[in-house]
Amino acid sequence: MRMPTTFGMNQIVSHGFGMFLFAALMPFMREAIEISAWQLATIGALTQLAYLGGAMLLGLVGHRLGTGRLALLTGIFSSALLLCMSQLRDPLLITLTLTCLAASAAISWGCIVEIVSRCARAEQRSTYLSCASSGTAWGYALNGLLILVVVPLLGWQASWQVAGLFGLLVVALTWHMLRDLKSAPACPTAGPAPVDAAIPTSKLFATIIGERTALFACLICLLVGFTTMPFSYWLNTYLDELSLPAALGGYTWATVGGTGMVAGFITGKLADRRGHGTALMVIFSGFALGLLAFILDPGRFALVAGFGYGLMYFPMWGIVAGWVNQHYSSTATMQISGICMVTFGLGGTLGNLLAGYIRETTGSLHDVFFVLTAASLLLVALAIVILRGNRKVLPIIPPTAGAF
């Protein structure tokens, strides 16, 4: 489990710290930094666009770069930026730094997908990818630990420094792992297509539109973005609208993080042993049932919704990438995963815009969660189609090149 553990730590740095630590520390940073609500909104928008840009860039040109070197470079870059955040006071420089961290996070995950798809044994890939993607949940937990322990004792600046130093440690561990990493042995049914075959940039979007697996992967990510991003953005506001205790939101998000920390390994094993369709059915059904219970009685079933969210969101990325890799080379899987991240962001943007419109016109968020529940049922429907579909894997053989 060395590979998924190391890459899970990369996710802690790139996503847990790079994407979410600022939001966790912002209440403490505002005491020393004059930053307006408008500037915070700008940071949110630009980081989202940067994440999409990084994912798109990876999908278009990532196959021309060495993913091993690129993974190390993004780790060094992210760690340096995290250390810089402890010294920044200018809102413009903070915005620029967070924007670069978001783009780096997208590229980092794409590199992880390619390396695991190429170097892990076929029967372990979904487990490894799901464990790695669940590193974000561990990042959530560590952010909370920084707030509870480091900030009271050493201040918010020390939290950024701890995150940056941890990132440098992860870079060293990643380099040590990649140094001796070799491609997985060929499967018995291997055919003539090389495992590192890339989809030409001019044909990438045609492939996604015209080929079932690539299209379904992007549709899944679109719907996941449409449901999860509005859920996370509006949940606490909705609980407040219902005059429920503020602590309920905290307990719900603790449930999300705790579930995500273990869901990757369990659901990844399920995907490798019982098939990706089965694993997708389990996680999407859990998410949909949690939302159904939540809209019936938000106060009673908020934790159930949090459990379903954690069960689905964190391991989903690894399971989908593992499923795509059954049909495409490791490099093509990285390219498609990059476009999947773009569709996820587009889905989240559409979901939040629709949620804002519904709240503006009705004065309530109640109908928003009905829409999210309906969309979650579409995810279940997609899982059923995949479960019943042809699971034949395209034959591939490993390349002669190493991780670098």
What kind of feature is each model-predicted range?
Residues 327-362:
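A late C-terminal transmembrane helix in Major Facilitator Superfamily
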Residues 22-23, 213-254, 258-260:
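Extracytoplasmic gate region of multi-pass secondary transporters
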Residues 54-66, 263-275, 360:
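Helix-to-loop junctions at the C-terminal end of transmembrane segments
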Residues 69-83, 278-292:
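Structural signature of the two symmetry-related core transmembrane helices
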Residues 182-216:
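Juxtamembrane intracellular "pre-TM" segments in multi-pass secondary transporters
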Residues 99-135:
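Cytoplasmic helix-loop-helix junction between adjacent transmembrane helices
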Residues 131-180:
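Helix-loop-helix hairpin linking two adjacent transmembrane segments in secondary transporters
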Residues 29-30, 61-62, 146-154, 239-240, ...:
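Interfacial helix-cap and linker-helix signal at transmembrane-aqueous boundaries
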